[in-house]
Design a protein with these regions (language model features):
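Short intrinsically disordered coil segments
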Residues: 94, 132-138, 169-175, 222-223
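Accessory alpha/beta interaction modules
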Residues: 1-152, 162-164
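Generic alpha-helical structural context detector
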Residues: 14, 29, 96, 177-180, ...
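Extended serine/threonine-enriched, polar tracts that run as long, contiguous segments within proteins
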Residues: 150-173, 180-181
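Short, charged alpha-helical interaction segments and adjacent helix-coil junctions
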Residues: 75-80, 173, 180-310
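Short runs of predominantly hydrophobic/aromatic residues within well-ordered alpha helices
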Residues: 24, 114, 152, 168-175, ...
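Short capping/connector residues at structural and topological boundaries
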Residues: 18-22, 92, 141, 166, ...
Length: 310
Protein backbone atom coordinates (compact mmCIF):
# COMPACT_ATOMS: atom_id res chain seq x y z
CA UNK A 1 0.00 0.00 0.00
CA UNK A 2 1.14 3.55 -0.73
CA UNK A 3 1.21 6.71 1.36
CA UNK A 4 -2.41 7.80 0.80
CA UNK A 5 -5.93 6.41 0.69
CA UNK A 6 -8.07 6.79 -2.43
CA UNK A 7 -10.15 10.02 -2.22
CA UNK A 8 -13.11 8.47 -4.06
CA UNK A 9 -14.03 6.14 -1.19
CA UNK A 10 -16.92 6.94 1.14
CA UNK A 11 -14.68 7.45 4.18
CA UNK A 12 -12.08 9.65 2.52
CA UNK A 13 -14.36 11.72 0.27
CA UNK A 14 -16.54 12.68 3.21
CA UNK A 15 -13.55 13.36 5.44
CA UNK A 16 -11.97 15.68 2.87
CA UNK A 17 -15.07 17.48 1.60
CA UNK A 18 -17.61 16.76 4.33
CA UNK A 19 -15.50 17.97 7.25
CA UNK A 20 -13.43 20.79 5.75
CA UNK A 21 -15.55 23.67 4.49
CA UNK A 22 -12.70 25.46 2.74
CA UNK A 23 -12.00 22.38 0.61
CA UNK A 24 -15.56 21.81 -0.55
CA UNK A 25 -15.84 25.55 -1.30
CA UNK A 26 -12.70 25.31 -3.44
CA UNK A 27 -14.09 22.22 -5.20
CA UNK A 28 -17.46 23.88 -5.91
CA UNK A 29 -15.87 27.05 -7.27
CA UNK A 30 -13.53 25.00 -9.46
CA UNK A 31 -16.08 22.60 -10.93
CA UNK A 32 -19.38 24.50 -11.10
CA UNK A 33 -20.21 26.95 -13.93
CA UNK A 34 -20.22 30.00 -11.66
CA UNK A 35 -19.50 33.58 -12.73
CA UNK A 36 -17.09 35.65 -10.66
CA UNK A 37 -19.91 37.29 -8.69
CA UNK A 38 -21.55 33.88 -8.09
CA UNK A 39 -18.60 32.18 -6.42
CA UNK A 40 -19.24 30.34 -3.15
CA UNK A 41 -17.85 32.24 -0.15
CA UNK A 42 -19.06 30.24 2.85
CA UNK A 43 -21.14 27.11 3.46
CA UNK A 44 -22.95 25.17 6.15
CA UNK A 45 -23.39 21.42 5.87
CA UNK A 46 -26.91 20.03 5.78
CA UNK A 47 -28.23 18.50 8.98
CA UNK A 48 -28.50 14.69 8.84
CA UNK A 49 -32.30 14.71 8.60
CA UNK A 50 -32.19 16.79 5.39
CA UNK A 51 -29.90 14.44 3.46
CA UNK A 52 -31.84 12.34 0.85
CA UNK A 53 -32.81 8.85 1.98
CA UNK A 54 -30.84 6.08 0.27
CA UNK A 55 -31.46 2.43 -0.47
CA UNK A 56 -28.78 0.12 0.92
CA UNK A 57 -27.25 -0.26 -2.54
CA UNK A 58 -27.09 3.53 -2.95
CA UNK A 59 -25.57 3.94 0.51
CA UNK A 60 -22.82 1.49 -0.40
CA UNK A 61 -22.02 2.84 -3.88
CA UNK A 62 -22.79 6.59 -3.70
CA UNK A 63 -20.76 9.07 -1.70
CA UNK A 64 -22.32 12.49 -1.11
CA UNK A 65 -21.70 15.80 0.63
CA UNK A 66 -24.55 18.32 0.90
CA UNK A 67 -24.35 21.97 1.95
CA UNK A 68 -25.85 25.45 1.63
CA UNK A 69 -23.98 28.72 1.13
CA UNK A 70 -24.48 32.22 2.53
CA UNK A 71 -26.85 33.03 -0.38
CA UNK A 72 -29.00 30.00 0.54
CA UNK A 73 -28.03 28.18 -2.63
CA UNK A 74 -28.05 24.40 -2.17
CA UNK A 75 -25.19 22.12 -3.26
CA UNK A 76 -25.20 18.33 -3.58
CA UNK A 77 -21.81 16.77 -4.35
CA UNK A 78 -21.78 13.07 -5.23
CA UNK A 79 -19.22 10.45 -6.16
CA UNK A 80 -20.85 7.62 -8.14
CA UNK A 81 -18.56 4.62 -8.40
CA UNK A 82 -20.76 2.36 -10.55
CA UNK A 83 -22.95 3.77 -13.33
CA UNK A 84 -26.60 2.84 -13.68
CA UNK A 85 -29.09 4.17 -16.23
CA UNK A 86 -31.30 5.49 -13.42
CA UNK A 87 -28.53 7.65 -11.90
CA UNK A 88 -29.32 10.82 -13.86
CA UNK A 89 -33.00 10.60 -12.98
CA UNK A 90 -32.15 10.10 -9.31
CA UNK A 91 -29.85 13.15 -9.40
CA UNK A 92 -32.67 15.21 -10.94
CA UNK A 93 -35.13 13.92 -8.34
CA UNK A 94 -32.88 14.75 -5.37
CA UNK A 95 -32.04 18.20 -6.75
CA UNK A 96 -35.76 18.84 -7.30
CA UNK A 97 -36.55 17.76 -3.75
CA UNK A 98 -33.92 20.16 -2.40
CA UNK A 99 -35.45 22.97 -4.49
CA UNK A 100 -39.01 22.22 -3.36
CA UNK A 101 -37.93 21.89 0.28
CA UNK A 102 -36.96 25.59 0.31
CA UNK A 103 -40.61 26.59 0.02
CA UNK A 104 -42.93 26.21 2.98
CA UNK A 105 -46.64 25.69 2.29
CA UNK A 106 -47.89 28.93 0.77
CA UNK A 107 -44.37 30.36 0.79
CA UNK A 108 -42.98 33.15 -1.40
CA UNK A 109 -41.55 31.67 -4.58
CA UNK A 110 -39.19 34.52 -5.40
CA UNK A 111 -37.06 33.59 -2.39
CA UNK A 112 -36.22 30.19 -3.89
CA UNK A 113 -32.52 29.78 -4.62
CA UNK A 114 -30.90 27.50 -7.22
CA UNK A 115 -29.75 23.98 -6.47
CA UNK A 116 -26.46 22.71 -7.88
CA UNK A 117 -25.80 18.97 -8.18
CA UNK A 118 -22.13 18.18 -8.85
CA UNK A 119 -21.73 14.52 -9.77
CA UNK A 120 -18.43 12.72 -10.25
CA UNK A 121 -18.91 9.47 -12.15
CA UNK A 122 -16.16 6.86 -12.08
CA UNK A 123 -17.31 5.24 -15.34
CA UNK A 124 -17.85 6.53 -18.87
CA UNK A 125 -21.58 6.77 -19.51
CA UNK A 126 -21.71 9.13 -22.50
CA UNK A 127 -19.75 6.96 -24.90
CA UNK A 128 -20.55 8.90 -28.08
CA UNK A 129 -18.80 12.14 -26.99
CA UNK A 130 -15.22 12.86 -25.90
CA UNK A 131 -15.99 15.64 -23.39
CA UNK A 132 -15.71 14.73 -19.72
CA UNK A 133 -17.76 17.69 -18.43
CA UNK A 134 -21.55 17.79 -18.93
CA UNK A 135 -23.69 20.69 -17.71
CA UNK A 136 -27.51 20.62 -17.79
CA UNK A 137 -29.81 23.52 -16.91
CA UNK A 138 -33.14 25.01 -17.97
CA UNK A 139 -32.75 27.12 -21.11
CA UNK A 140 -35.05 28.37 -23.85
CA UNK A 141 -34.99 26.04 -26.86
CA UNK A 142 -34.43 28.92 -29.33
CA UNK A 143 -33.03 31.78 -27.24
CA UNK A 144 -30.33 30.11 -25.17
CA UNK A 145 -29.60 33.30 -23.22
CA UNK A 146 -33.06 32.95 -21.64
CA UNK A 147 -32.57 30.81 -18.54
CA UNK A 148 -34.76 29.64 -15.65
CA UNK A 149 -32.36 29.69 -12.72
CA UNK A 150 -33.47 26.69 -10.70
CA UNK A 151 -31.69 23.39 -11.21
CA UNK A 152 -28.07 23.03 -12.33
CA UNK A 153 -26.79 19.49 -12.92
CA UNK A 154 -23.13 18.78 -13.63
CA UNK A 155 -21.76 15.33 -14.47
CA UNK A 156 -18.00 14.73 -14.64
CA UNK A 157 -16.77 11.51 -16.26
CA UNK A 158 -13.51 11.00 -14.38
CA UNK A 159 -12.05 8.40 -16.72
CA UNK A 160 -12.25 10.79 -19.69
CA UNK A 161 -10.32 13.52 -17.90
CA UNK A 162 -6.86 14.12 -19.41
CA UNK A 163 -4.98 16.94 -17.62
CA UNK A 164 -2.43 17.54 -20.38
CA UNK A 165 -5.16 18.79 -22.71
CA UNK A 166 -6.22 21.71 -20.49
CA UNK A 167 -4.36 24.96 -19.92
CA UNK A 168 -7.19 26.95 -18.31
CA UNK A 169 -9.25 26.36 -15.16
CA UNK A 170 -6.22 25.47 -13.08
CA UNK A 171 -8.12 24.56 -9.89
CA UNK A 172 -10.52 22.36 -11.83
CA UNK A 173 -7.58 20.46 -13.28
CA UNK A 174 -5.88 20.15 -9.87
CA UNK A 175 -8.99 18.79 -8.14
CA UNK A 176 -9.68 16.35 -10.96
CA UNK A 177 -6.07 15.19 -10.85
CA UNK A 178 -6.51 14.73 -7.10
CA UNK A 179 -9.57 12.54 -7.71
CA UNK A 180 -8.08 10.54 -10.59
CA UNK A 181 -4.36 10.21 -9.84
CA UNK A 182 -4.28 9.61 -6.08
CA UNK A 183 -4.96 6.00 -5.07
CA UNK A 184 -3.92 3.75 -2.21
CA UNK A 185 -0.94 2.72 -4.35
CA UNK A 186 0.40 6.29 -4.60
CA UNK A 187 3.80 6.59 -2.91
CA UNK A 188 4.39 10.25 -3.73
CA UNK A 189 1.87 12.87 -4.86
CA UNK A 190 2.68 14.97 -7.96
CA UNK A 191 4.50 18.22 -7.15
CA UNK A 192 1.74 20.34 -8.75
CA UNK A 193 -0.76 18.99 -6.23
CA UNK A 194 1.54 19.44 -3.25
CA UNK A 195 2.27 23.05 -4.25
CA UNK A 196 -1.39 24.08 -4.08
CA UNK A 197 -2.51 24.92 -0.50
CA UNK A 198 -6.02 23.42 -0.72
CA UNK A 199 -5.05 20.25 -2.57
CA UNK A 200 -2.01 19.81 -0.33
CA UNK A 201 -4.31 20.00 2.72
CA UNK A 202 -6.58 17.40 1.15
CA UNK A 203 -3.59 15.12 0.53
CA UNK A 204 -2.57 15.45 4.17
CA UNK A 205 -6.06 14.25 5.17
CA UNK A 206 -5.62 11.19 2.93
CA UNK A 207 -2.39 10.02 4.58
CA UNK A 208 -2.86 6.47 5.81
CA UNK A 209 -1.36 7.17 9.22
CA UNK A 210 -4.30 9.44 10.08
CA UNK A 211 -6.83 6.57 10.04
CA UNK A 212 -7.76 4.17 12.83
CA UNK A 213 -7.94 0.37 12.34
CA UNK A 214 -11.75 0.63 12.37
CA UNK A 215 -11.70 3.29 9.65
CA UNK A 216 -9.35 1.16 7.57
CA UNK A 217 -11.74 -1.78 7.84
CA UNK A 218 -14.59 0.46 6.66
CA UNK A 219 -12.39 1.69 3.79
CA UNK A 220 -11.56 -1.87 2.70
CA UNK A 221 -15.21 -2.91 3.02
CA UNK A 222 -16.24 -0.07 0.69
CA UNK A 223 -13.85 -1.20 -2.05
CA UNK A 224 -14.82 -4.85 -1.59
CA UNK A 225 -18.43 -3.87 -2.17
CA UNK A 226 -17.55 -1.79 -5.26
CA UNK A 227 -15.54 -4.71 -6.65
CA UNK A 228 -18.50 -7.06 -6.18
CA UNK A 229 -20.87 -4.56 -7.80
CA UNK A 230 -18.58 -4.21 -10.81
CA UNK A 231 -18.37 -7.98 -11.16
CA UNK A 232 -22.16 -8.27 -11.01
CA UNK A 233 -22.58 -5.37 -13.45
CA UNK A 234 -20.08 -6.92 -15.88
CA UNK A 235 -21.81 -10.30 -15.64
CA UNK A 236 -25.18 -8.67 -16.32
CA UNK A 237 -23.69 -6.68 -19.19
CA UNK A 238 -22.27 -9.84 -20.75
CA UNK A 239 -25.59 -11.65 -20.34
CA UNK A 240 -27.43 -8.72 -21.91
CA UNK A 241 -25.01 -8.63 -24.84
CA UNK A 242 -25.34 -12.41 -25.24
CA UNK A 243 -29.14 -12.12 -25.19
CA UNK A 244 -29.00 -9.28 -27.73
CA UNK A 245 -26.81 -11.39 -30.01
CA UNK A 246 -29.17 -14.36 -29.70
CA UNK A 247 -32.15 -12.13 -30.42
CA UNK A 248 -30.36 -10.70 -33.47
CA UNK A 249 -29.67 -14.24 -34.77
CA UNK A 250 -33.29 -15.25 -34.13
CA UNK A 251 -34.55 -12.13 -35.94
CA UNK A 252 -32.28 -12.90 -38.89
CA UNK A 253 -33.54 -16.49 -39.02
CA UNK A 254 -37.14 -15.28 -38.84
CA UNK A 255 -36.45 -12.80 -41.64
CA UNK A 256 -35.01 -15.59 -43.81
CA UNK A 257 -38.00 -17.82 -43.04
CA UNK A 258 -40.42 -14.98 -43.84
CA UNK A 259 -38.61 -14.34 -47.10
CA UNK A 260 -38.93 -18.01 -48.01
CA UNK A 261 -42.63 -17.96 -47.16
CA UNK A 262 -43.11 -14.85 -49.31
CA UNK A 263 -41.18 -16.50 -52.13
CA UNK A 264 -43.30 -19.67 -51.83
CA UNK A 265 -46.48 -17.57 -51.80
CA UNK A 266 -45.31 -15.72 -54.89
CA UNK A 267 -44.57 -19.01 -56.66
CA UNK A 268 -47.98 -20.36 -55.65
CA UNK A 269 -49.66 -17.22 -57.01
CA UNK A 270 -47.75 -17.61 -60.28
CA UNK A 271 -48.78 -21.27 -60.56
CA UNK A 272 -52.36 -20.35 -59.77
CA UNK A 273 -52.31 -17.62 -62.43
CA UNK A 274 -50.89 -20.12 -64.95
CA UNK A 275 -53.68 -22.60 -64.27
CA UNK A 276 -56.25 -19.82 -64.53
CA UNK A 277 -54.84 -18.71 -67.86
CA UNK A 278 -54.86 -22.32 -69.07
CA UNK A 279 -58.57 -22.59 -68.15
CA UNK A 280 -59.27 -19.31 -69.93
CA UNK A 281 -57.49 -20.51 -73.08
CA UNK A 282 -59.42 -23.79 -72.97
CA UNK A 283 -62.71 -21.95 -72.47
CA UNK A 284 -61.96 -19.61 -75.35
CA UNK A 285 -61.28 -22.52 -77.73
CA UNK A 286 -64.40 -24.39 -76.57
CA UNK A 287 -66.52 -21.28 -76.98
CA UNK A 288 -65.13 -20.78 -80.50
CA UNK A 289 -66.17 -24.34 -81.38
CA UNK A 290 -69.72 -23.74 -80.16
CA UNK A 291 -69.74 -25.62 -76.88
CA UNK A 292 -72.53 -24.71 -74.49
CA UNK A 293 -71.63 -22.19 -71.78
CA UNK A 294 -72.73 -24.61 -69.05
CA UNK A 295 -70.43 -27.34 -70.43
CA UNK A 296 -67.49 -24.93 -70.64
CA UNK A 297 -68.08 -23.81 -67.05
CA UNK A 298 -68.22 -27.41 -65.83
CA UNK A 299 -64.97 -28.39 -67.59
CA UNK A 300 -62.86 -25.26 -66.85
CA UNK A 301 -64.28 -24.15 -63.51
CA UNK A 302 -64.80 -20.61 -64.82
CA UNK A 303 -67.97 -18.74 -63.99
CA UNK A 304 -70.63 -18.07 -66.58
CA UNK A 305 -69.83 -14.35 -66.38
CA UNK A 306 -66.12 -15.00 -67.02
CA UNK A 307 -66.91 -17.22 -70.03
CA UNK A 308 -69.38 -14.72 -71.50
CA UNK A 309 -66.73 -12.03 -71.18
CA UNK A 310 -64.25 -13.93 -73.35
Amino acid sequence: MGKYLDPRADLTFKKVFGEHKNLVISLLNALLPLKDDERVESIEYWPAEKIPKRTQVEKDSIVDVCCKDNKNREFIVEMQMTWTESFKKRVLLNASKAYVAQSEAGGVYDTLQPVYALNFVNENFMKDVDDYYHYYHLVHDKYTDKVIDGLHLVFVELKKFKPQTFTEKKMQVLWLRFLTEITDKTLEAPAELLENPEVSEALKILEIGAYSPGEMRAYDKFWDYISRQRTIANDIRREVEKAKAEIAVAKAEIAVANAKVEEANAEAEKAKAKLKQKDIDTARRMKAKGYAIADIAEITGLTVEEIEGL
